[in-house]
Amino acid sequence: MLLMNLQLFAHKKGVGSSKNGRDSESKRLGTKCGDGQFVLAGNILVRQRGTKIHPGVNVGRGGDDTLYAKVDGIVKYERVGRSKKQASVYPVEIENVAE
């Protein structure tokens, strides 16, 4: 009887897949101004996809659902009902000190 000690090797070299190694740039979504923060008119409050947060008092909604302040004031994030959230900007009186 003939015994052969045989070791088989791979006939193709293992190579990393070219289907990996890509990723899209982050979109930098999220809140840009916190609750109670003073903002100027035109400042972006929230960048979002869809209306996770709805526009409230003195807040506008852009074409890409971005929320922005329409007046100078203080940002307030509020809950309306069980699940709806909204962002509002309430104007504040600023005293000008004449010197």
Swiss-Prot record:
Superkingdom field:
Bacteria
Q: How is it modified after translation?
A: The N-terminus is cleaved by ribosomal processing cysteine protease Prp.
Membrane-crossing residues?
none
What's an example GO BP annotation here? translation
Descriptive protein name: Large ribosomal subunit protein bL27
Q: Any chance you could tell me the propeptide residue ranges?
A: 1-9
| Matches recorded under SUPFAM superfamilies | Ribosomal L27 protein-like (SSF110324)
Molecular function (GO) terms for this protein are: structural constituent of ribosome
Cited PROSITE patterns? RIBOSOMAL_L27
A Gene Ontology term for the protein's cellular component:
cytosolic large ribosomal subunit
One protein family per Pfam? Ribosomal_L27
Record keywords, A-Z: Ribonucleoprotein, Ribosomal protein
Which family does the similarity line name?
Answer: Belongs to the bacterial ribosomal protein bL27 family.
